[in-house]
Amino acid sequence: MQRDIFVFQCVIGCRVSDLRRLTKASIVDGAVEYIPKKTKGEKPLVVRVPLNAIAKGIIEKYHDTPGDRLLPCISDQKYNDAIKEIFTIAGLTRPVTILNPVTGEDEKRPLNEVASSHLARRCFIGNLYKQVKDPNLIGKLSGHAEGSKAFARYRDIDEDMRKELVTLLV
């Protein structure tokens, strides 16, 4: 079940706090609509993400979730623990560079040890950026304001994108 929830989050791009607040009424005309909790106090912005086949399949699978909730949710800690376990079982253990919050130094850690719900949002934004390369368009789907500095933390120019850019010089 938590694998499905993580995949849903990967194709919707919302924060886990917003995922928990989604209800069946959040689905409007084939899209999920919500006001991000993090920005509710500022200028409320309605985020609308069209549902793809994967998201629709997951919603259908859990259509009988009790109450008005769109999907079954567990506590943040249990969800993050489940994500780490899923990554371990799937063999997603490649080393990644992270910033140690205590020392402020870069360090290598296995992906399965650092994976969390926020990785789904990073995947959503990063995968869209590889396809579209338009931060303003992607920002409309992720809830980032135009020119957002926070958005820059999510997009990654990977090796394939670097190769593609260099071929433009020829």
Residue ranges: model-predicted function:
Residues M1-V16, R20, Q77-K78:
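Basic, Lys/Arg- and aromatic-enriched nucleic-acid-binding interface segment
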Residues R21-I27, Y129-Q131, G139-E146, R153-I157:
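A short, basic/aromatic helix-end/turn motif that makes direct DNA contacts
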Residues K38-K40, Y79, S142-T167:
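Catalytic-site neighborhood detector that most strongly recognizes the C-terminal catalytic loop/helix
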Residues M1-Q2, S75, Y79, S117, ...:
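Hydrophobic (often cysteine-bearing) scaffold residues that line and stabilize catalytic clefts
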Residues L45-G57, K61, A152-V170:
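DNA/chromatin major-groove-contacting recognition/catalytic segments
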Residues D64-R69, K84-K140, H144:
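Short, basic (Lys/Arg/His-rich) helix/loop patches that form interaction surfaces
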Residues I12, R21-E60:
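Conserved tyrosine-mediated DNA breakage-rejoining catalytic core shared by Y-recombinases
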